[in-house]
Amino acid sequence: MKNISLLGASGSIGTQTLDVLRSHPDQFRLVAFSVGKNIDYAVKVIQEFSPQIVSVQREEDVLKLQSVSGNTKIVYGSEGLLEVALHPDAEIVVNAVVGSVGLLPTLRAIEAKKTIGIANKETLVTAGHLVMEAARKHNVSLLPVDSEHSAIFQCLNGENEKRISRLIITASGGSFRDKTRDELHHVTVEDALRHPNWSMGSKITIDSATMMNKGLEVIEAHWLFGIPYEQIDVVLHKESIIHSMVEFEDRSVMAQLGSPDMRVPIQYALTYPDRLPLSDTKQLNLWEIGTLHFEKMDQERFRCLRFAYEAGKAGGSMPAVMNAANEVAVEAFLQKRIGFLTVEDLIEKAMNHHNVIARPSLEEILEIDAATRRFVMEQI
């Protein structure tokens, strides 16, 4: 029986993580979780899983939950998030929150020697050097939950990582993969939220449409696997059947395939190095699919992917700036305050405005994050 703390239980990854726990009640126990403002959902999860601690975003929601929570302790805010991450009984902390708010709980959980199931891209994007140094120092495993990084992780199992020639990350292309840049001037929020292959939260779905999601994954892969950016490629693969590939120095290529279902990489992170049945996921029958398609990525068409490579290669504080600018811009687009292509423009402005700090401390990263958010808000 593994004890799990779950940060971000009401999001897309969080709800699918609970599906996995639900499927294997003899293998996993939910000891703590956090939610944002979805209190009705929190009540249902408390009643089903009887966790010891639950954290909510707002203080005013604490009383609402206490009246129905039984013996579950209710906490709130950033301190509450830390309490969930540091639950003494938790063996695995699944970081499924959206945005840079996941950074501090991850670092503290690593220091407490918890195994980390990392679904929060922004943690490694904004502070990859700090996270990986902490993981090495405390001998903690970072197990990828993203389908692409889980695929790479599985391809590397038992391999000599010094023999890697290239990582090849696949991209579905998002909601607008077949549109020209001219057509993108007129797309709506509703258009952007219709992802062709995956069911995800609104922020990551917009990131998929801009291709920023893939850019964040490139930076994440750089840190998780220690591979230079020059050896990380992205290929457009509309079917989302091959989740990623690894090329070795003898030009052999290993790929991980499967029907698009986020519960597969989530469960693998929780069960690693073992596997468990996942009977209600669709079996992959290649003859039903027939043909798989691949295209070279056009970084002028998908400018956010180019920004991510530029930020990653610049290093230091630049990825944190790019990430903060993106979060503010995406939120403004979702609120219909800016157009779709303005997201790219705001990110570019923020990056051009910033002078890189080579090895920023945690405090500097948090300051840069806040300053970038203010800068971008002023541009809107």
Swiss-Prot record:
Pathway the protein acts in: Isoprenoid biosynthesis; isopentenyl diphosphate biosynthesis via DXP pathway; isopentenyl diphosphate from 1-deoxy-D-xylulose 5-phosphate: step 1/6
Family, per entry: Belongs to the DXR family.
Catalytic activity reported: 2-C-methyl-D-erythritol 4-phosphate + NADP(+) = 1-deoxy-D-xylulose 5-phosphate + NADPH + H(+)
PANTHER family: 1-DEOXY-D-XYLULOSE 5-PHOSPHATE REDUCTOISOMERASE, 1-DEOXY-D-XYLULOSE 5-PHOSPHATE REDUCTOISOMERASE, CHLOROPLASTIC
Membrane found in the keyword field: no
Function per UniProt: Catalyzes the NADPH-dependent rearrangement and reduction of 1-deoxy-D-xylulose-5-phosphate (DXP) to 2-C-methyl-D-erythritol 4-phosphate (MEP).
Pfam families, per the entry: DXP_redisom_C, DXP_reductoisom, DXPR_C
Gene Ontology terms: biological process: isopentenyl diphosphate biosynthetic process, methylerythritol 4-phosphate pathway involved in terpenoid biosynthetic process
Residue numbers binding 1-deoxy-D-xylulose 5-phosphate: K121, S147, E148, S172, H195, S208, N213, K214, E217
Names of the cofactor(s): Mg(2+); Mn(2+)
UniProt protein name: 1-deoxy-D-xylulose 5-phosphate reductoisomerase 2
HAMAP family from the UniProt entry: DXP_reductoisom (MF_00183)
SUPFAM superfamilies noted in UniProt: 1-deoxy-D-xylulose-5-phosphate reductoisomerase, C-terminal domain, Glyceraldehyde-3-phosphate dehydrogenase-like, C-terminal domain, NAD(P)-binding Rossmann-fold domains
GO molecular function, one term: NADPH binding
Keywords: Isoprene biosynthesis, Manganese, Metal-binding, NADP, Oxidoreductase
Upper lineage: Bacteria, Bacillati, Bacillota, Bacilli, Bacillales
Binding-site list for NADPH: S10, G11, S12, I13, G36, K37, N38, N120, E122, G201
EC number: 1.1.1.267
Taxonomic source organism: Bacillus cereus (strain ATCC 14579 / DSM 31 / CCUG 7414 / JCM 2152 / NBRC 15305 / NCIMB 9373 / NCTC 2599 / NRRL B-3711)
Residues binding Mn(2+): D146, E148, E217
